From Swiss-Prot:
This is Putative L-ribulose-5-phosphate 3-epimerase SgbU. It comes from Escherichia coli (strain K12). Keywords: Carbohydrate metabolism, Isomerase. It catalyses: L-ribulose 5-phosphate = L-xylulose 5-phosphate. GO terms for biological process: DNA repair; L-ascorbic acid metabolic process; L-lyxose metabolic process. SUPFAM superfamilies: Xylose isomerase-like.
Length: 286
């Protein structure tokens, strides 16, 4: 058994798998858990309306396989953001949040990862920020009532691209049910002092996403997806050394989007082995 649970993102696995098949495959590839995606597509949004029988079936599959789903990546708020100028969109954002909390409670999901966007497809201004703040405060209250953790991901846009920026929201909301979910790729791409950022948030980190990225520069917008491990700007050995010094005890999630790749299984096994090698190099025993 690992000292630190290592999971794989659902979108790294073939899309046409059933949930029992997905869990078995993750286990056979050496992973401890799968992170569920509820994104902005109608297909994945429909999970929020699963029947009791569908929910029970997935819980049974987790028990039978020994592979859990401790976290949900709720990126549906890109399409339906709390900060939208459209009241109907904001109402839909709240409905999605309520249903996601209920699904998490039923499935035993402990952490819902929120995207740190006030808006995504609309222009940002002080109004979108204020409406996002109101929606987020409401969401944290709902999650607290169900004992479900909300953790904001450090993002690929400037709005929430550091733990330092997240910390201001933490101070405002002041809830034990509101934490941070750092993505070391995003943290690195924006030129942050990554060790200092991790130290700043260490007591509030719910889990950590592992991916590589290309940096944002004056000549480049960066690349936040599909960068092979070892070909980007992330200093994984340095990060694992920092986390070892900080006595980080949480889990890690390898974030990949290989569900349409020719050999997704081979790619995720290679990614796991590469990450484990960097951990070993850093003296961080996974």
């Amino acid at each position: 058994m690992r000292n630190h649970q290592l999971g794989i993102y659902e979108k790294a696995l073939a899309k046409d798998l059933s949930w029992p098949e997905r869990l078995v495959l993750a286990k056979s590839c050496g992973f401890d858990f799968v992170e569920m995606s509820v994104d902005e597509t109608d297909e994945r949004l429909s999970r929020l309306d699963w029947s009791a029988a569908q929910r029970t079936s997935l819980v049974a599959a987790m028990i039978e396989t020994g592979v859990g789903i401790p976290s949900m990546c709720l990126s549906a708020h890109r399409r339906f953001p709390f900060g939208s100028r459209d009241e109907a969109v904001r109402e839909r954002a709240r409905e999605i949040m309520s249903k996601a909390i209920r699904l998490a409670r039923d499935l035993g999901i402990r952490t819902i990862q929120l995207a740190g966007y006030d808006v995504y497809y609309e222009d940002h201004d002080e109004g979108t920020r204020q409406r996002f703040a109101e929606g987020l405060a409401w969401a944290v209250e709902q999650a607290a009532a169900s004992q479900v953790m909300l953790a904001v991901e450090i993002m690929d846009t400037a709005f929430m691209n550091s733990i330092s920026k997240w910390k201001k929201w933490d101070e405002m909301l002041a809830s034990p049910w509101f934490t941070v979910y750092p993505d070391v790729g995003n943290l690195s791409a924006w030129g942050n002092d990554v060790p200092a950022e991790l130290k700043l948030g260490i007591d509030r980190i719910a889990a950590i996403h592992l991916k590589d990225t290309q940096p944002v520069t004056g000549q480049s917008p960066g690349q936040f997806r599909d960068v092979p491990f070892g070909e980007g700007c992330v200093d994984f050995v340095g990060i694992f050394k920092t986390l070892h010094k900080l006595n980080y005890r949480g889990s890690f999630l390898i974030e990949m989007w290989t569900e349409k790749a020719k050999e997704p299984v081979l790619e995720i096994i290679q990614a796991r082995r590469w990450i484990e090698a960097r951990m070993q190099e850093a003296g961080f025993i996974c």
